A protein has these predicted regions:
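Core catalytic lobe of class I
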Residues: 2-262
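Short, conserved SAM-binding/catalytic segment
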Residues: 1-9, 264-278
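Short, flexible loop/turn segments with low-complexity composition
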Residues: 159-163, 274-279
Length: 279
């Protein structure tokens, strides 16, 4: 099943199917940016996919789809791969990274911070969302990895597109790189989930990421250079939503019919720019 949607300046193509069958049909080097989050093999209850493979099976499957992505990624393209483990099995993301090393260069390691507690003026400020862990051995898991993979590690980025203002404004005139009061955000990205009332109604997927995370990755690569983007594990369309509102053409591939239908519904609901899409 294939849906072709127009949202403002973007053409969003959503395909229901197996990415290992769809990716070989794409021209070589035809994708500028890939943003995705595959199943982590943590035993999550997806509607269709079996998330309980042996480690060997899972890594071999990872090898197959990452090589397929490498073929379609443009020479100066960026591949942002969100991957996570669990406290009792922390090696999973590192083993996935080693598989990716067969086809890509790791250019940047980004830490997606979902929740954080910081000391501010002698008070503790806790913001974001986390799932409490009932354990005396493990800490609550508040961070996931986003691996920025490229062919040769030489892709130039639009770092100030996601830059932040200087807290000390004297730096604006002190540093030549200060520009229009912006400096590099760095590789720790605080992107919390939006508050929802009902998982089944508002976010009917067991392992989605916020559209804002995908938007930030695409803006870092450079919106002007992102002619076509890809998410081979589209889920309920987080990357598609980001692309719709950034005005970037996108192809999303999703195995499950229910998640695919929800992605189509969500993209059709895009009518105006959101905060995460603003330059």
């Amino acid at each position: 099943m294939r849906e072709l949607l127009r949202t403002g300046r973007a053409t969003i193509e959503l395909v229901q199917g197996d990415c290992l069958e769809v990716l070989p049909t794409l021209p070589e080097g035809s994708i500028d940016v890939v943003v995705t989050s595959p199943p982590y093999n943590l035993g999550i209850d997806y509607a269709s996919y079996d998330d309980r493979q042996s480690r060997e099976q899972y890594l071999e499957w990872t090898r197959r789809w990452t090589k397929a992505v490498a073929r379609v990624l443009a020479p100066k393209g960026s591949f942002f791969l969100n991957v996570a483990g669990k406290p009792s099995d922390p090696w999973g993301p590192l083993e996935v990274a080693q598989v990716c090393r067969e086809s890509f260069t790791l250019q940047n390691t980004i830490y997606w911070v979902k929740s954080i507690a910081v000391e501010v003026d002698e008070a503790t400020l806790s913001v974001g969302h986390y799932k409490p862990i009932n354990s005396r051995r493990y800490l609550n898991d508040c961070v996931e990895l986003v691996l920025h993979l490229t062919h040769e590690g030489k892709v130039e980025l639009d770092r100030l597109a996601i830059g932040v203002e200087y807290a000390d404004k004297s730096n604006v005139t002190r540093w030549r790189s200060a520009g229009a009061d912006r400096h590099c955000r760095g590789n720790a990205w605080f992107v919390p989930y939006s508050t929802i009332q009902s998982r089944d109604k508002d976010r009917p997927h067991p392992a989605s990421y916020p559209p804002a995370l995908a938007a930030q990755a695409i803006r870092l690569h450079g919106v002007e250079r992102a002619q076509r983007t890809l998410d081979p594990f589209s889920g309920i369309g987080s990357t598609a939503l980001a692309c719709a509102e950034l005005g970037v053409d996108h192809l999303g591939i999703e195995l499950d019919a229910l998640y695919h239908a929800e992605a189509v519904r969500r993209v059709r609901g895009v009518t105006s720019p959101s905060l995460f899409a603003r330059r």
